[in-house]
């Protein structure tokens, strides 16, 4: 029995309501929100792989007492971490360089989740909308935090109706539903982008496998069917997996991280621009008062 069949198998076959487990709860017919899926198995595998990776990195780091003793593994990972640190400092400023470990972990987590499908029989966790929405929610919370941190009350004024008096714009503090809806756009955009791209690759690979199963199952000569299936699978399947799992998986992880950088940097830059404009305004008033 494959891992997919093991995970998707119902954990409780008893029909009596009194003996039902939490996995059998079905608010809507055909939908069991608490039933484990193969994406859950994929998340657990990614957790174990990343935990093993960092433990191994820590052990290797302790043994490396000089640059000469550093292995290629340590050098590559340190180069990746330095790149993330520099990117964080360039886009978010030196004061936010402390967020570099988060972006590094986010990149490794998404890429690992995309590559877990190479193990066979396991759908990538990123093919689940719940998973990508959770990642998007973390990015969205960061947007709000960065907006409040750098823009203060001006962040909330963006979601209210404004009026212009003598060329100056003032906030009415009356909520603007369209601005509020647009404020949630990054959450849905970044979540659906990752989910849609990975799900599309998963569906294409599934259709490809089922297509060849259908073709070769019609051959009465079983040894011939197995031989042809092996040849076609060996020639074509690796190419598709390299593109949809490896290339697309790494690319989508990179895109997600860079979009998170962009959203956070936008909040910071808008706040700095407003603060600079306010400082120039007050300096101008002070100069005028001194000259009067």
Swiss-Prot record:
Chain's gene name: atpB
PANTHER family registered for this protein in UniProt: ATP SYNTHASE SUBUNIT A, CHLOROPLASTIC
Keyword list, A-Z: ATP synthesis, Cell membrane, CF(0), Hydrogen ion transport, Ion transport, Membrane, Transmembrane, Transmembrane helix, Transport
Protein known as: ATP synthase subunit a
GO cellular component: plasma membrane; proton-transporting ATP synthase complex
Gene Ontology biological process terms in this record: proton motive force-driven plasma membrane ATP synthesis
Subunit and partners: F-type ATPases have 2 components, CF(1) - the catalytic core - and CF(0) - the membrane proton channel. CF(1) has five subunits: alpha(3), beta(3), gamma(1), delta(1), epsilon(1). CF(0) has three main subunits: a(1), b(2) and c(9-12). The alpha and beta chains form an alternating ring which encloses part of the gamma chain. CF(1) is attached to CF(0) by a central stalk formed by the gamma and epsilon chains, while a peripheral stalk is formed by the delta and b chains.
Transmembrane segments: 39-59, 73-93, 102-122, 128-148, 172-192, 196-216, 231-251
Subcellular location: Cell membrane
Organism placement in taxonomy: Bacteria, Bacillati, Mycoplasmatota, Mycoplasmoidales, Mycoplasmoidaceae
NCBIfam families: PRK05815.3-3
Keyword Zinc: no
Membrane topology note: Multi-pass membrane protein
Summary of the function given for this chain in its UniProt record: Key component of the proton channel; it plays a direct role in the translocation of protons across the membrane.
GO molecular function per UniProt: proton-transporting ATP synthase activity, rotational mechanism
Similarity annotation: Belongs to the ATPase A chain family.
InterPro entries listed in its UniProt record: ATP_syn_F0_a_bact/chloroplast, ATP_synth_F0_asu, ATP_synth_F0_asu_AS, F0_ATP_A_sf
